[in-house]
Amino acid sequence: MAVFTPVNLEAMELQEEMSTADVVLLLSSVPERTSDLVYWLDEARLRYRHGPAFPTLGSLIAHLVVAAPKVDALLRHAHLDGQTSADVRAAIDPSHDQELTVPLQEALEDFARVRRRTVDLLHGWGKSEWDRVISDPRGGELTLLDACRLVVKHEMAHVAQIRNLNALLPEPRDLGPVPPVEINGQ
């Protein structure tokens, strides 16, 4: 019988890199997965904070929605304009301090629309585009494929975070009818 220690388990992890097809598939699935997890949330649940160190679901969704056009612009400028330097980390991970400024459904639709544009752009890329190197002031040099892999890993982590926070939302309680309030003895 084999004993699996943490060292053995680490050695068993897949070291396989995401292919371009994997990257495109995962990028295209994030808006739909996010929508599936949160479409039913009301405003109170979007603003519910599980604890002081936890973001609200609304702020996580806003984070993804705000990052999507930044990532799209970064990839478009690198591909179409030949830009060779970009702050990839700033595009992927803008501030977490935002809340949704538009209704949830509108934010999800905007996210899906922007992401469709990005995926349409990526579908036309050949090996030379994926292998194009850009310089990130915080991360050094990386290919556009590596930049997209970072985006996928970051966004999928947020999808898992949304799923987990969603599962921990308190169940609504029916407190019964509101008793009439007497004003001035009446």
Model feature map: region roles:
Residues 2-13, 24-25, 45-91, 133-186:
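Short, contiguous alpha-helical
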Residues 7-19, 94, 100:
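Short, contiguous pre-domain boundary segments
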Residues 23-26, 30-34, 67, 71, ...:
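Alpha-helical packing segments of well-folded alpha/beta enzyme cores
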Residues 27, 92-135, 146-151:
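Acidic/histidine-rich alpha-helical segments that form the ligand environment
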Residues 31-33, 37, 41-45:
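N-terminal first-folded block
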Residues 40, 63-64, 124:
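Conserved catalytic core of Hanks-type protein kinase domains
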